Amino acid sequence: MDTKTFKRTLQHSENYNRKGFGHQAEVATQLQSEYQSSLIQEIRDRNYTLQRGDVTIRLAQAFGFCWGVERAVAMAYETRKHFPTERIWITNEIIHNPSVNQRMQEMQVGFIPVEAGNKDFSVVGNNDVVILPAFGASVQEMQLLSEKGCKIVDTTCPWVSKVWNTVEKHKKGDHTSIIHGKYKHEETIATSSFAGKYLIVLNLKEAQYVADYILHGGNREEFLQKFAKACSAGFDPDRDLERVGIANQTTMLKGETEQIGKLFEHTMLQKYGPVELNQHFQSFNTICDATQERQDAMLELVQENLDLMIVIGGFNSSNTTQLQQISQERGLPSYHIDVVERIKSINSIEHRQLNGELVTTENWLPAGKIVVGVTSGASTPDKVVEDVIEKIFALKATAAVF
C-alpha cells in the first residue's frame, strides 16, 4: 500500500478531523479543574522545592503532561462535547494513565473490544465517532475505519507522525527501517505499519547482535527466531540489511537511541566505506523533545542528595519506565507507582519493578528528615502528583506525632 497517498486522502476526507471542533476554551477550563494542581504550581514557583515538617520534596524541572498528551486529551474532551449523543469509540487507551482512561469511560467513550488478541471493529457503526489515541493507529486500522465511513478524530502526537514520515522516507529509498522500540507497544505497531521492510530492536544489546550479523553473517534461522515478532513479513536478514535507516519509538531512552544510530552508522561505514555510506545508511532526528527534556531533568535530579525517588506514571507507560531506569541506574531507592493508593502506609508501598513485576516493599519511608525526589511520566496529570506528595507529607506528619 502507498501509505503516504492513503494518509493524504484520509486527511482530506470530510469524516476526518485532527484540529478540534472549536471548543478549546471551554475544554481548557474543564481540564484545568480536573488535572492541574495549585500545589504543584507552588512547588514550581519555589524553585521546584517544598519543605514541610521532616520532608523536603525535590521535583524534576520537566515532568508530567507533555504538549502531545495535553492535545490528545483536550481533543477527546472536545469530541464528546461536539458529539453529545453519538457513540464514541477509541482504538486504544488515549494515553497511558489509569485515571485519564477511567475518565474517558465515565464520559461514555468506549474502548474497542479485544477478542483473542485482536480488536473487534464490528462494534463500530458508520454513524459512530472513533478517536485515534496519542500513540496513533496502524494504517490497517485507519483504512478499515475509513471504509466504514465513520467519523475519525485523530489525536496522534505530531512527534509520532514525524517518525512515520521518516520510515516512509526509508521505504522510498529501499532502506529497511531499524526501529528502536518495543514491538508490542501501540506506537511501534503503528510506526511499523507505515514502514516497508522493518526490524524492531529493544535495546543496544539487540542492536549489537544485528550489527554483528551485518558485518560477519551468522545463523539465519537463529536470527529469524530471535526477531520473529519484531520484523516485517518475509524478512530476510541476508537480503534486507544491506540498506538501513534508523527510527525510534518516541518514548525510548534518548541516549540509547543515539548509541544505536551511531552503531549502525559505524557498521555500514565499516562494511561499505565512506564513499558508499549514504547509499546504505539513513538517519533523521526523531527523538521527541518532551521525552528528552524529562530524561535530562531526571538525570539532573538524581545527582542531588536524595533519600529516595518516586516515579509516577502508568505501569504500561514506556517513558515513565525509562525515568525509573535512570533512577535505578543511579542506585537510588526508587518506586514506580501509578496512583496514590499504591502507598499503603508509612511502612508499605506497592510498586512496579523494571521487569514488570508488581512488588510490595516494607519500611520504604526512612525515619527522620528526608529528601524525596519526585517526577512523573508524560501522561501523568499534576493532580496525581499532588495526591502522592500530600500522602507522603501526611504519613511523615503522623509519624512525627508518635
UniProtKB/Swiss-Prot annotation:
GO terms of molecular function: 4 iron, 4 sulfur cluster binding; 4-hydroxy-3-methylbut-2-enyl diphosphate reductase activity; metal ion binding
Record pathway: Isoprenoid biosynthesis; dimethylallyl diphosphate biosynthesis; dimethylallyl diphosphate from (2E)-4-hydroxy-3-methylbutenyl diphosphate: step 1/1; Isoprenoid biosynthesis; isopentenyl diphosphate biosynthesis via DXP pathway; isopentenyl diphosphate from 1-deoxy-D-xylulose 5-phosphate: step 6/6
Sites where the protein binds (2E)-4-hydroxy-3-methylbut-2-enyl diphosphate: H96, H185, T250, S317, S318, N319, S379
Binding site for isopentenyl diphosphate: H96, H185, S317, S318, N319, S379
Annotated active site: E187 (proton donor)
Transmembrane segments: none
Domain of life of the source: Bacteria
Residues annotated to bind [4Fe-4S] cluster: C66, C157, C288
Binding note for cofactor: Binds 1 [4Fe-4S] cluster per subunit.
EC number of the protein: 1.17.7.4
CDD domains to which the protein is assigned, alphabetical: lytB_ispH
Sorted UniProt keywords: 4Fe-4S, Iron, Iron-sulfur, Isoprene biosynthesis, Metal-binding, Oxidoreductase
Binding site for dimethylallyl diphosphate: H96, H185, S317, S318, N319, S379
Cofactor: [4Fe-4S] cluster
Substrates-to-products reaction catalysed: isopentenyl diphosphate + 2 oxidized [2Fe-2S]-[ferredoxin] + H2O = (2E)-4-hydroxy-3-methylbut-2-enyl diphosphate + 2 reduced [2Fe-2S]-[ferredoxin] + 2 H(+); dimethylallyl diphosphate + 2 oxidized [2Fe-2S]-[ferredoxin] + H2O = (2E)-4-hydroxy-3-methylbut-2-enyl diphosphate + 2 reduced [2Fe-2S]-[ferredoxin] + 2 H(+)
InterPro entries: LytB/IspH
GO biological process: dimethylallyl diphosphate biosynthetic process; isopentenyl diphosphate biosynthetic process, methylerythritol 4-phosphate pathway; terpenoid biosynthetic process
Cited function: Catalyzes the conversion of 1-hydroxy-2-methyl-2-(E)-butenyl 4-diphosphate (HMBPP) into a mixture of isopentenyl diphosphate (IPP) and dimethylallyl diphosphate (DMAPP). Acts in the terminal step of the DOXP/MEP pathway for isoprenoid precursor biosynthesis.
Family note: Belongs to the IspH family.
Annotated PANTHER family: 4-HYDROXY-3-METHYLBUT-2-ENYL DIPHOSPHATE REDUCTASE, CHLOROPLASTIC
Protein name as annotated: 4-hydroxy-3-methylbut-2-enyl diphosphate reductase
Source organism of this protein record: Nostoc sp. (strain PCC 7120 / SAG 25.82 / UTEX 2576)
Taxonomic lineage from the root: Bacteria, Bacillati, Cyanobacteriota, Cyanophyceae, Nostocales
